């Protein structure tokens, strides 16, 4: 399963609750993008969440 290279975000799991409070499993997936960034001075392709990109924690090469 892919995860965010910077924050470590990955798919979260929980329950979907109906109006009658029946439960069924569901998942929340982060918006991961494959980007090239500099890691230790060398370009590397990694998965980064869109939120991390927007916050400016990483810059594309």
Curated annotation (Swiss-Prot):
Biased composition (Polar residues): 9-25
Entries under Pfam families matching the protein: Ribosomal_L28
GO molecular function: structural constituent of ribosome
Full protein name: Large ribosomal subunit protein bL28
Domain of life: Bacteria
Keywords: Ribonucleoprotein, Ribosomal protein
HAMAP family cross-referenced by the UniProt entry: Ribosomal_bL28
Similarity comment: Belongs to the bacterial ribosomal protein bL28 family.
GO cellular component: ribonucleoprotein complex; ribosome
């Amino acid at each position: 399963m892919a995860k965010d290279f910077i924050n470590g975000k990955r798919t979260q799991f929980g329950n979907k609750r109906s109006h009658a409070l029946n439960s069924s499993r569901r998942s929340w997936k982060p918006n991961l993008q494959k980007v090239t960034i500099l890691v230790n001075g060398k370009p590397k392709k990694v998965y980064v969440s869109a939120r991390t990109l927007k916050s400016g924690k990483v810059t594309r090469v």
